[in-house]
């Protein structure tokens, strides 16, 4: 068989097969199998590379997306099978995530709710609307606590619901109002005209401060708040915190010997999340690249 392959460019295939006694069907089956094995070997190599480049954070869905970005064709069953053989798997999310809360006594309506009246059943329900058509239409914010032996850090970010980008953030050793104003200042410095934007939050005390209301009002930003005790009203932000903690914090708490180390890891993760971490919602692209491509199409 090897001789037939090597001499194929110099002699007619039918002659080589007749002399060697190899059947035509056998020859093509073997050639196709070798080609397939070579392709599988390359895909296996790519899967391992993607997995380790992302520190084991990707499961089969994101690995499949990234394979497509790199020009490789495969289906989810194949990727799952190869990952199983390699003994690698993505991070399994922990249970329901709850962000840091504080005193709550809401003062604003939830602008992300739509009232739905079913006259036939005499029933009224409310549907959440996180949909957008461009960046800077709907932002959301919240505060999350990171607790290690050395103490606590609090992360306060703003997330754009369109491309899931972290627009700005602040890491502090206490959840004070200076943290909130710093986060706002960074976001406003990045973007000029934000008139009409909805900025959503829970009913945390920070978002009820007079200065906070005034800063939003001055820029034509509409303030929105979740209903009391209803974390699903702010699920895009809650989901981000859950993903972040599953990927860089849970199970690694004891690796951080100081708050400075933890803060560096938080900053590094957000940089990674914005610039490298792909997701299905953003068509297999990281948030910032998705925004840039959308911007070119006049979407952001």
Predicted regions and their residues:
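Basic, flexible linker segments flanking DNA-binding modules
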Residues: 1, 24-133, 230, 286-295
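Short, flexible loop/turn motifs enriched in small residues
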Residues: 10-13, 134, 148-154
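Residue-centric detector for conserved, function-critical "anchor" positions
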Residues: 1-10, 15, 37
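Active-site beta-loop-alpha junctions of metal-dependent nucleic acid enzymes
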Residues: 147, 151, 170-192
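Short, acidic, Ser/Thr-enriched surface-loop or helix-capping motifs
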Residues: 148, 160-161
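Mobile genetic element proteins and their domesticated derivatives, centered on retroelements
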Residues: 16-20, 27, 47, 63, ...
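C-terminal domain-tail junction helix/linker
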Residues: 217-221, 243-300
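RNase H-like two-metal-ion nuclease catalytic core shared by retroviral integrases
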Residues: 99-103, 201-203, 209-212, 223-245, ...
């Amino acid at each position: 068989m090897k001789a037939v392959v090597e001499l194929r460019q110099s002699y007619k295939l039918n002659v080589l097969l007749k002399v060697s006694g190899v059947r035509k069907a056998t020859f093509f089956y073997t050639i196709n199998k070798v080609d397939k094995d070579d392709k599988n070997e390359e895909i296996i190599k790519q899967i391992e590379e993607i997995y380790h480049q992302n520190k084991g954070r990707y499961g089969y869905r994101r690995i499949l997306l990234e394979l497509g970005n790199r020009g490789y064709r495969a289906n989810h069953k194949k990727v799952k099978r190869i990952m199983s053989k390699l003994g690698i798997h993505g991070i399994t999310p922990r249970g329901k995530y709850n962000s840091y809360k504080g005193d709550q006594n809401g003062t604003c309506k939830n602008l992300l709710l739509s009232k739905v009246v079913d006259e036939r059943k005499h029933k009224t329900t409310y549907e959440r609307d996180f949909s957008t058509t461009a960046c800077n239409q709907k932002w959301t914010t919240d505060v999350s606590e990171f607790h290690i032996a050395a103490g606590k850090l609090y992360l306060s970010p703003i997330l754009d619901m369109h491309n899931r980008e972290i627009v700005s953030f602040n890491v502090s050793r206490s959840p004070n109002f200076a943290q909130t104003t710093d986060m706002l200042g960074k976001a406003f410095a990045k973007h000029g005209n934000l008139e009409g934007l909805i900025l959503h939050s829970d009913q945390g005390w920070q978002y009820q401060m007079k200065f906070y209301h005034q800063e939003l009002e001055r820029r034509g930003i509409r303030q929105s708040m979740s209903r009391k005790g209803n974390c699903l009203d702010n699920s895009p932000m809650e989901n981000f915190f859950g993903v972040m903690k599953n990927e860089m914090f849970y199970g690694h708490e004891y690796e951080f010997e100081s708050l400075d180390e933890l803060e560096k890891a938080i900053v590094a993760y957000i940089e990674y999340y914005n610039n490298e971490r792909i997701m299905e919602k953003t068509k297999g692209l990281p948030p910032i690249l998705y925004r840039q491509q959308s911007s070119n199409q006049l979407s952001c």
